């Protein structure tokens, strides 16, 4: 069997041309498309991995933030509870202090009011007692009592010391006023003469003596000599007693 080298060569050339054409027009675009697709897939995979890494990082960041928030929340809750307890204790202490202050104030006010009431009651009782004593003495004051009062006054006058008498005499001389004798009731002539004579004996001169009635003296006599007062009466005694018990 003989070979037609021309035909063989032509077929080889045609095959090579066909391969070249296929490679240029068909295989090259397919390869480029496959490479582009591969690059795109690779890029997608890379992007996906990057997104996965970023997602993991975000997840970890969120978890960390969540943990921090939880810790902060617990810290805030603990602090808020402690602050609330402290405030409650402070309010309770203030309420107790206020209650104690009010109780002490009320107790003090009550005790003071009780004392004031007791003092006022005591003063009222004393006042009524002394008023009753005045009225009783006034009712019991008769002529015999008046004479005894005059006698007692004369004795009291005679017990004055020399210094007192000299001072009274000087005041009488300087003032030029008469000796004024006041009595709860008007003195009869004998009582007036008794007192006048006693005054003249004491002062050793004829000083003028005047007599006046003063019901407020209550069974007593009072002498005013140039500004010097010599009292002897129940009213003075009662006032002294009132001052002592006030």
From Swiss-Prot:
Keyword set, alphabetical order? ATP synthesis, Cell inner membrane, Cell membrane, CF(0), Hydrogen ion transport, Ion transport, Membrane, Transmembrane, Transmembrane helix, Transport
Q: How does it assemble?
A: F-type ATPases have 2 components, F(1) - the catalytic core - and F(0) - the membrane proton channel. F(1) has five subunits: alpha(3), beta(3), gamma(1), delta(1), epsilon(1). F(0) has three main subunits: a(1), b(2) and c(10-14). The alpha and beta chains form an alternating ring which encloses part of the gamma chain. F(1) is attached to F(0) by a central stalk formed by the gamma and epsilon chains, while a peripheral stalk is formed by the delta and b chains.
Function field: F(1)F(0) ATP synthase produces ATP from ADP in the presence of a proton or sodium gradient. F-type ATPases consist of two structural domains, F(1) containing the extramembraneous catalytic core and F(0) containing the membrane proton channel, linked together by a central stalk and a peripheral stalk. During catalysis, ATP synthesis in the catalytic domain of F(1) is coupled via a rotary mechanism of the central stalk subunits to proton translocation.
Q: Where in the cell is it found?
A: Cell inner membrane
Q: According to the lineage, what is the superkingdom?
A: Bacteria
Q: What's the source species' lineage?
A: Bacteria, Pseudomonadati, Planctomycetota, Planctomycetia, Pirellulales
Q: Tell me the gene name.
A: atpF1
Keyword hit for Ion transport: yes
* The family this protein is said to belong to: Belongs to the ATPase B chain family.
What's the source species for this entry? Rhodopirellula baltica (strain DSM 10527 / NCIMB 13988 / SH1)
Q: Tell me, what's a Pfam family for it?
A: OSCP
A cellular component term from Gene Ontology for this protein is: plasma membrane
Bilayer topology term: Single-pass membrane protein
Bilayer-crossing regions: 5-27
List the InterPro entries. Answer: Alt_ATP_synth_F0_bsu, ATP_synth_b/b'su_bac/chlpt, ATP_synthase_B_chain, ATPase_OSCP/dsu
Put simply, this protein is called ATP synthase subunit b 1
